């Protein structure tokens, strides 16, 4: 069995990976996301960010044998504009106000790197999420919980903001931050059967 390393500090990703893998390591990536400029293709961009994270972590590993590094990045897009993590409460409020009553996309890029062979596979998942119409009071109360501040698009579907979601089309786990079905098929492609 290969050693699996998750290149992420995200507790949500760690919790999700524990659902399908009993044994893995966590090494936080120090990849500078601003080193990859966004042009106009969100799926390519998110896969390149995931690869950057995986490669960044691979450089920290002394024992090159038998290690696979999983890099992942999740972005929220609305009207082909990327909504990252909010800078402050005002930014979070404005993001949620824009998403209110509208459909947006959540993209996750995945990259799995075999350190020894330098083989890498990349893919992405896109899930469409439709929010109900939200009142200013609902948004303000949610923003004041602090929950949106560390999340792309200023919300976490698995928390209090789950009530904002009218429907989703695609992978729920993608919206949380780690598309398990896609990850499983990619791990199988790299010789790991769960």
From Swiss-Prot:
The active site is at 73 (proton acceptor). One of its GO terms (molecular function) is dTTP diphosphatase activity. The record marks 12, 74, 158 as: Important for substrate specificity. The keyword Transport does not apply. GO terms for cellular component: cytoplasm. Its cofactor is a divalent metal cation. Keywords: Cytoplasm, Hydrolase, Nucleotide metabolism. The keyword Cytoplasm applies. Gene3D superfamilies: 3.90.950.10. It comes from the Bacteria. SUPFAM superfamilies: ITPase-like (SSF52972). It catalyses: dTTP + H2O = dTMP + diphosphate + H(+); UTP + H2O = UMP + diphosphate + H(+). GO terms for biological process: nucleotide metabolic process. It is an enzyme of class 3 (hydrolase). It is found in: Cytoplasm. Its main location: cytoplasm. Its EC number is 3.6.1.9. InterPro entries: ITPase-like_fam, Maf-like. Belongs to the Maf family. YhdE subfamily. Nucleoside triphosphate pyrophosphatase that hydrolyzes dTTP and UTP. May have a dual role in cell division arrest and in preventing the incorporation of modified nucleotides into cellular nucleic acids. This is dTTP/UTP pyrophosphatase. It comes from Clostridium botulinum (strain Okra / Type B1).
